[in-house]
Amino acid sequence: MLKFIIPTIMLMPLTWLSKNNLIWINSTAHSLLISFSSLLLLNQLNDNSLNYSLIFFSDPLSTPLLMLTMWLLPLMLMASQSHLIKEPPVRKKLYITMLIMLQALLIMTFTATELILFYIMFEATLIPTLIIITRWGNQTERLNAGLYFLFYTLIGSLPLLVALVYLQNTTGSLNFLLLQHWAKPLSASWSNIFMWLACMMAFLVKMPLYGLHLWLPKAHVEAPIAGSMVLAAVLLKLGGYGMLRITSMLNPLTEHMAYPFLMLSLWGMIMTSSICLRQTDLKSLIAYSSVSHMALVIAAILIQTPWSYMGATALMIAHGLTSSMLFCLANSNYERIHSRTMILARGLQVLLPLMATWWLLASLTNLALPPTINLVGELLVVMSVFSWSNPTILLMGANIVITALYTLYMLIMTQRGKHTHHINNIIPSFTREHALMALHIIPLLLLSLNPKIILGPLY
């Protein structure tokens, strides 16, 4: 595992010692090399996890998430270049250092064997993200957004620490690989119910569950482009990863406790999709759509069948690449028009025809068109939820229809229509942006050729 962590950490001195005109080239090129080295993780045995040492391991659940994390750093660096063009070199280097630090912490989160190490890294990812949002965000509301983000996640995850200390005292170990075999079946007593809530709440806030999701649109809208990308693509997946890991220790209580949360996520899925239809702000629309996609993942994880687990992991990876691409597209619009309001950015197909192609592809993957892995994930989730309870097909069907509606709305509002007076002279799209979109969409399409690598440990 050190072959990923040490090169990532060594990107920091590389950035600080680069000449001013080579900052972006050096950091992007070397982070791309690191992300290609992550392909080595795919070479795994079918029946077991790879234990690198006592503290790091990877199995078919954490491997795709790890690869997504490493793949995202060069993309974030590519996306941030024009955002930081007016900043002095020291601040550029500081920004890049924050992103690198975030990636190192995420790698350690996804590979930790020890639950306390997982918790510490899970909390530590908060710090660079918060600095990125509150320092480089666009409006002054970014401080408010940072406050929401900080307190929602901290209040959610404090009970988790208490629960972990309790687990350590009762079982004597917090190793994932041991606890799966040692954990005593939890009965439905009051203390166990609170224990279950304490374990799950941190991840439900991070996912976010409908009702605990208010920090997410705020943080997304105010964050700079790299902040939005890493928040949508990886930080939401931390919640899903933690839930998948910790539910195996909370049985059979989960079957008893999951009902309110299942209902909340299924209802919240419809609600957030409907909220998307009334959005004026482009980034806010994409943020709410990712809440509705993550609600599917919560429902799938709480049902706890092999199919739903496979659907949840597939949907997490697919959503990571898709929503990250949508945020990049929204940002490329924002850099030209300096407004996120959709009414002011109409008719861009005439002005930026190739960008319209990327918009179309991103929208189609967002509404889960057949060849993509989004469809694989959604089908598995819908089938497993249907076999858990038949009437849920109404909610699922409604959600799929509304998803198609708001995606179409987003596409038509940005690409079609009569363009407004103030965008007659905008900059053409750069090769860098096209490369960025291609690097998002190519992995999505390639994964649809062989989806079994992202179907998780139960495949």
From Swiss-Prot:
Catalytic activity reported: a ubiquinone + NADH + 5 H(+)(in) = a ubiquinol + NAD(+) + 4 H(+)(out)
Membrane topology: Multi-pass membrane protein
Residues that span the membrane, as ranges: 22-42, 60-80, 92-112, 113-133, 147-167, 193-213, 224-244, 257-277, 284-303, 307-329, 350-370, 393-413, 435-455
Keyword annotations: Electron transport, Membrane, Mitochondrion, Mitochondrion inner membrane, NAD, Respiratory chain, Translocase, Transmembrane, Transmembrane helix, Transport, Ubiquinone
Cellular localization per UniProt: Mitochondrion inner membrane
Principal location listed in the UniProt entry: mitochondrion
Pfam families in the record: Oxidored_q5_N, Proton_antipo_M
Any one GO molecular function term: NADH dehydrogenase (ubiquinone) activity
Entry's EC annotation: 7.1.1.2
UniProt function note: Core subunit of the mitochondrial membrane respiratory chain NADH dehydrogenase (Complex I) which catalyzes electron transfer from NADH through the respiratory chain, using ubiquinone as an electron acceptor. Essential for the catalytic activity and assembly of complex I.
PANTHER family the record matches: NADH-UBIQUINONE OXIDOREDUCTASE CHAIN 4
Protein name as it appears in the record: NADH-ubiquinone oxidoreductase chain 4
Organism: Balaenoptera musculus
Lineage, opening ranks: Eukaryota, Metazoa, Chordata, Craniata, Vertebrata
Gene name of the encoded protein: MT-ND4
